[in-house]
Amino acid sequence: MPNAYVSGTGYYVPERIVTNDDLAREYGIDTNHEWIVKRTGIEARRYAPEGVGTADLAVHAAEMAIKNAGIDKHDLDMIVFATLSPEHCFPGSGVYLQQKLGLCDGPNAKFIPALDVRNQCSGFLYALSTATSMIKSGAVKHVLVVGAETHSAALDLSTRGRTVSSLFGDGAGAVVLSATEEDRGIRRWKLGADGRYADTLAQRIWDIRKRPFIPVDENGIGQVQPEMMFAQMDGKTVFKNAVERMIGVLFEVLAPEKLTGLDIDLFVFHQANLRINQYIQQTLAIPDEKMVHNIERYGNTTAATIPILLAEAVESGKLKPGMKVAMVAFGSGFTWGAAVCDW
C-alpha cells in the first residue's frame, strides 16, 4: 500500500491589506485596533478586488504547489477543493480551478475528477484525508488539495456585524499530495462532527425548505434579510468547543502512533482566533518555537489557513523534510479534524 506525502506547497493572498483601523476608517465600523487585537490577535486581513473569486485565488496557490512538487499539471489525477465560498451555488469551485489551470485543454488534456468539500474551517483536513485515502487505495498518484476563500464578498461590514466580520480574510493555500513507497507522509488522520451545533455558526443565505428558497417580492426580486445574508455566531460556545475538540482530536491521532506532543516538531493549528490557539498551547505546554501562526496578518481564511501556514513554513525554512507535523482544525458544523505526518 503506497503512502501519501506532501510533495509541494503553495499559497496566495490578495494584495490589498485591510487593517483594523481601516475597518473603522473606510467602512465606518464602531471598532478599533486594540479592541480586535485583544479579542482575536488579528491586526490585518487581505481582501480580494471586485471580479476576483475563490478559484482565481486558488489557481495561484495551485500553480505554486505544482511547481514545488516538481511535476507537470497534467500529472495530476484529482482535485479536492475545500471552500465555504464557492463562485456559485453550483457547480463547485473545483471545476473552475480545473478550467483555470487548463487541464482540459491541448494535446495533453486530462479530464480528472474535481471534488468540492464543504466543511468550513475543517475543510482542508477533510480534503487532505480524502486525498490520502484515494492515494492509499492505489487509485491515484498525485492529488491537488486546495483550501481557498473569498470572505470579503459576504461580510457585514457595519457595526452590527463587527464581531464576525473583523475575523475573516481572503486567501488560498494548496498542496500536492503524492504516492510514495517510502516510510513518510500522512501517518494518521481523524475527523469528527457534532450536528447538534449546526446553527451555532452558520450563514443561512437561503432556506431550501421554503418555496422559493429566497423570498421574492411581487416583481420577482429577491429579498434577503441581514440575519440570513451574513454569518451568525455564538462566539463563547464556539471558543469552548474549539478548545475541547482540538485538544481531543490531537490526542486521537497521536496516541495510536505512540506519539506525544514532545515528538511533534511543528504544530499547525487552524487560525480561527489567536486566543483559542494560545489557550491550547498553554494547556499542552507547547514551546513557542514549535508553533506557527499568521492570523495577525491574514485573519481567519477558514479552509485556507493550514495550507497557507504549511507553504509559508516551507518557504521560510521552518518546516523541513523529516520533521513530524501535527495539523488540527475546528469549524462550523461543528466539525473538526487532525492529521499527523512525517514531512
Predicted regions and their residues:
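Short glycine-rich or small-residue beta-strand-to-loop segments that form or flank ligand, phosphate
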Residues: 77-84, 267-268, 294
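Conserved catalytic cysteine-centered active-site region
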Residues: 30-56, 84-143, 148, 282-310
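Phosphate/pyrophosphate-binding loops at sites that engage ATP/ADP/AMP, CoA/4′-phosphopantetheine
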Residues: 61-77, 248-265, 313, 317-318
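Flexible, glycine-rich active-site loops centered on histidine and acidic residues
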Residues: 136-171
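Active-site pocket-lining segment
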Residues: 242-247, 261, 265-283
